[in-house]
A protein has these predicted regions:
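Short beta-strand-centered aromatic/proline hotspots
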Residues: 45-48
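Aromatic-patch recognition
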Residues: 50-199
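Boundary at the C-terminal end of the N-terminal hydrophobic targeting segment
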Residues: 20-26
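Bacterial N-terminal signal peptides
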Residues: 8-17
């Protein structure tokens, strides 16, 4: 084997572990303010770190103490002011310690309060025999509630990505640049306290509301709503709730 080919193979093999590790690196969400209502009736407030993969809260109180709160001990909580770092810059281009946090602009109205509820969850294992308390963000009113779980994942930016052709092509070979990807899972919270996974949101929502399915599709078309977008789907589920309530009131 000639020397250039050996060098190329060696370079590729050294980069593969880095790329693979970057695919599944989950990172917590940070919020500037929160109000957490515990199952014992107490209420705590402060900045909050949400570890979605662990269903765990870290709340920094006004006196600087940090409370670790598992989902089992939480009745409900609300957060506002999601904090992000400059996650589209590689470490060598800024001083992380001195760089002030900024509000995440991925979603509109970052400062609004975002309520969370706790439901028993089987982690989407169809044949699971047990569940555990887990956090779900509430996106609409009810009685059928649209729920969301978000996961922030650190991924490596491909070298071929056009976002990096200006100013960042000088980074050393083998040093990947990371960015934050947002994964979103949607569910329905039923009035009975269970949840329904929306693996294919349009199909599953229409299946849950069979009597209203035709009207829901018409409503979505009229208002240009996408069943796969959380904010859009919240409007559709609210409309489904109103249709059911109208039907119940006439019976």
């Amino acid at each position: 084997m000639n020397r250039p080919l050996r060098y190329c193979l060696s370079l590729v093999s050294s980069l593969l572990p880095l790329a693979a590790a970057a695919q599944l690196k989950s990172i917590p969400q940070e919020f500037a303010a929160s109000t957490v209502v515990l199952t014992n009736g107490d209420t705590i407030r402060g900045s909050l770190v949400l570890h979605n993969d662990l269903d765990l809260l870290l709340v920094t109180m006004a006196d600087g103490t940090v409370r670790t709160v598992p989902a089992l001990a939480v009745r409900t909580f609300a957060v506002s002011g999601e904090v992000m770092r400059f996650d589209r810059l590689p470490p060598q281009y800024y001083n992380y310690v001195s760089t002030p946090p900024r509000m995440r602009r991925r979603w509109a109205q970052v400062q609004r309060a975002r309520p969370f509820l706790v439901y028993p969850w089987d982690h989407d294992h169809d044949y699971a025999t047990s569940t555990a308390p887990a956090f779900f963000e509430r996106l609409n009113g009810g009685p059928v509630i649209l729920l969301r779980r978000q996961r922030l994942v650190s991924r490596a930016m491909p070298w071929s990505d056009p976002s990096w052709v200006s100013g960042y092509t000088t980074r050393p070979v083998g040093m990947p640049t990371y960015y934050t990807d947002v994964r979103e899972l949607l569910y329905l919270g039923t009035p009975q306290g269970s949840i329904v996974a929306l693996r294919r949101p349009k199909r599953d929502v229409l299946a849950y509301f069979p009597a209203e399915a035709e009207q829901l599709e018409q409503f979505a078309r009229q208002h240009n709503l996408d069943f796969n977008e959380g904010a859009h789907l919240a409007r559709i589920v609210d409309y489904a709730n109103s249709l059911r309530q109208m039907t119940a009131s006439t019976q």
